[in-house]
Amino acid sequence: GAAWRVKDLTLTPSPYLKGYLDEFLQDTRLSPLTETNRGCPFECTFCVDGVGSRQKIFKSSHDRVKAELIYIASKTRSKYLQLADVNFGMFPEDIEFSKLFSKIKNEYDFPHHIQVCAGKNNQERIIKCGEILDGSLRFGASIQSMDDEVLKNIKRSNISYEKLIEVSKRVSNTEASTYSEVI
């Protein structure tokens, strides 16, 4: 049967808020990792997030993310934050999370850089998140192949080359950095 999943992410105790990761937060070679949501609506064949049991998106609460970020910001020696979200900018809540990250940065001087995989289907929201975060955001866009037959067989569609360049240019105007990768 389908794998069981936690539907309410706030029911899982935060390892940050429990203090379990304090020693790692002091190591400048490491970056804290958190998430605002879990799951992916797409079905890419070779992606663990594309399997049927993970297709439903479960979101964390604003209060939980805020508490974790304040805790991390007060303990970490890193300037980087990794977000495990696989489609950041896809959901309306991502605007609110971007505002939260910006507020935390202004109050705690953290995070200077946020690494996240951006959603490809809502370019305006992605750009808005970049504007709110004023240079802190590092957006990644991934492709698995440039061959249409391969993409069909693996149930994936890429953002068009033209759109990728357009979004990269527009995001660059927000002072966010971008990167792409072949996965």
Where does each model-flagged region fall?
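Glycine-rich beta-alpha loop elements in corrinoid/cobalamin-binding modules
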Residues: 1-8
